[in-house]
């Protein structure tokens, strides 16, 4: 299986889906079990550290998530410009309880337009004032044409984005939005990640 997995990654895939050979092993969308298992690249590689990012927006969900958000737009903080710059859209790692809790926590902070301190190319369906910090993990930091963290600082017309972001389950109530992971810290993480790969 490991050789199939490595070949899939080399071919640009996210990973493998492994299926049981039992007769009752049928795919059921949105259902979790052990008859079909995802074996993804980010399960094998991950950031050296987690990121504490600020919720600045949300995108509508579909299907079972229609009553909540599908993903949250997350940002780092840049103290030099006093701006929150996008790093990822995160939609995995959330439990049913998290959806309800986040809906309650963010409701009072919803605003009509993008906050003036938010630097985003993406247009969220819902905007929030920078308020809530969440701990996020992922596979790696990559150059991004849509995220504004480190925009033009590493490559022209590119920022840095987090691949395969996932909520760790940790709410950082101990941090203000300005205490979130900084743009400078993310640039350093990206540069260290490149050194490790080489």
PLM-predicted stretches and their roles:
Residues 116-122:
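Short catalytic/ligand-gating loop segments at beta-alpha or beta-beta junctions
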Residues 179-198:
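Acidic, low-complexity intrinsically disordered tails
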Residues 1-112, 123-126, 133-184:
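Nucleic-acid 5′ end/cap handling module spanning
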């Amino acid at each position: 299986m490991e050789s199939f997995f490595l070949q899939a990654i080399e071919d640009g895939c996210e990973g493998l889906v492994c299926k049981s050979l039992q007769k009752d092993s049928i795919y059921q969308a949105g259902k979790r079990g052990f008859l079909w298992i995802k074996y993804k690249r980010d399960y094998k590689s991950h950031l050296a550290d987690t990121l504490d990012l600020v919720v600045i927006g949300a995108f509508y969900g579909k299907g079972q998530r229609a009553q909540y958000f599908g993903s949250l737009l997350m940002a780092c903080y840049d103290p030099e410009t006093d701006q929150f710059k996008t790093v990822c859209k995160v939609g995995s790692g959330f439990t049913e309880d998290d959806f309800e809790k986040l809906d309650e926590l963010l409701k009072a902070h919803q605003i009509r337009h993008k906050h003036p301190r938010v630097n985003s190319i993406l247009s969220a369906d819902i905007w929030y004032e920078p308020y809530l910090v969440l701990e996020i993990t992922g596979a790696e930091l990559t150059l991004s044409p849509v995220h504004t963290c480190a925009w033009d600082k590493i490559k022209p017309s590119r920022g840095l984005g987090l691949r395969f972001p996932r909520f760790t389950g940790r709410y950082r109530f101990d941090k203000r939005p300005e205490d979130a992971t900084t743009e400078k810290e993310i640039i350093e993480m990206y540069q260290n990640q490149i050194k490790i790969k080489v």
